[in-house]
Amino acid sequence: MATTSDLRTNMIIRHNGQLHRVMEFYHHAPGNWRAMVIMKLKNIETGKTIEERVRAGSEIEIVRVEKRPMQFLYREGDIYHFMDTETFEQIEVAEDLIGEPAKFLKENEMADILFYDDNKILGVEPPLFVTLQVTEASVAVRGDTATNVNKQVTLETGAVISVPAFVNQGDYVRVDTRTGEYIERIK
């Protein structure tokens, strides 16, 4: 067993029988009381965020997470199909396990599948940045504004993001999959 001194941000721990991601934590020593560690935890299954206080030095159970790079093959309804490029083993992942980044998964691209406890799927981490083609964009009118203006565009995966007015249909853009924000236009 590990102690609270082993905590790290984004670590997966088992707390009260459920898996949680450590969003943030800090050590607190109030006057003449015993020191404590205050953790902000996000439940993996429900997505609910809680704040938990434990004594400094108390034991915590760290869940060993294994990352395996796999190729995204295709989507069938709300099931995503991935393949291990070394063993050619295929797995199915439900859309709710992937979460928001699902809208940035492009066929034949690589993503990291997170496993725990004898090959149970914890989630999917797509690449931090993806390059996608703009399939739908409204036309920007010259002289329309005096300041920076963004417009909504639809990408080839169906995701809708906000981009600067100079981005047109058919352009390629780089997107941050963690936030869903436009980074740059690719020439």
UniProtKB/Swiss-Prot annotation:
Family: Belongs to the elongation factor P family.
Protein name (database record): Elongation factor P
SMART domains recorded: EFP, Elong-fact-P_C
A Gene Ontology cellular-component term: cytoplasm
Annotated metabolic or biological route of this protein: Protein biosynthesis; polypeptide chain elongation
Compartments in which it is found: Cytoplasm
Gene for this chain: efp
GO biological process: peptide biosynthetic process
Keyword hit for Repeat: no
Main location: cytoplasm
